[in-house]
Design a protein with these regions (language model features):
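Predominantly extracellular/luminal regions of secreted and cell-surface proteins
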Residues: 25-56
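Surface-exposed, low-complexity/disordered Ser/Thr/Gly/Pro/Asn-rich loops and linkers
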Residues: 55, 63-69
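Accessory beta-strand-rich segments of carbohydrate-active enzymes
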Residues: 8, 12, 18-20, 27-33, ...
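A generic, residue-level signal for flexible/boundary positions that often mark functional hotspots
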Residues: 49-51, 64, 75
Length: 170
């Protein structure tokens, strides 16, 4: 079995497709939910925004503030993927997907400034199809995550709290 495949995920599609974990070198920015009127544009590059700082996944933005583990807030994660990692070819029949093992709580995924998908709640994995939004060269993924409490009886965390995989399906 290839080393890139997590031992806890013995699903057939991991063996039939090309998968690559993309947990490193994300950029992150958090703001209170009350400031949603000033949220980022899905086309805004985080590299030029001083509010962003580098993080690796998995990431929980609530855990750093032990005084307020139920802070209503939203986070923005951005990753630019080079053509070395995602060699998109428009003439190919290959399909590209992002597989999220877990994002808490509600999230929307943008690819190159266009909404590619969304997922509500956070205790299940999901996939987002990238192919219709990809371009040759670098591609930018932006994940907007909203956390609003109360939503559970225990600490649930907030953010992309599990691995993210880039998946190529022939």
């Amino acid at each position: 079995m290839p080393a890139e495949i997590p031992t806890g995920h013995r699903k057939a599609w991991f063996f039939m497709n090309t998968c690559r974990r993309i947990n490193s070198e994300w950029l992150f920015f958090k703001q209170p939910l009350s400031e949603t009127a000033t949220t980022l544009s899905p086309t805004l590059p985080a590299q030029n925004d001083s509010r962003f700082h580098p993080v690796n996944l998995p990431h929980d933005w609530l855990i750093a503030n032990s005084a307020d583990h139920y802070e209503n807030s939203e986070g923005w994660y951005q990753k630019t993927i080079s053509s070395d990692i995602l060699p998109f070819d428009a003439s190919s029949d290959d399909d590209w997907l992002l597989y999220f093992e877990g994002v808490y709580m509600d999230c929307t995924i943008f690819v190159n400034g266009m909404q590619a998908g969304e997922w509500k709640y956070g205790y299940s994995s999901f996939e987002v199809r990238l192919t219709p939004f990809l371009k040759t060269g670098e591609n930018t993924i932006l994940v907007h995550v909203r956390y609003q409490s109360p939503n559970s009886r225990w600490y649930s965390g907030a953010g992309i709290y599990r691995s993210v995989w880039l998946k190529k399906v022939p």
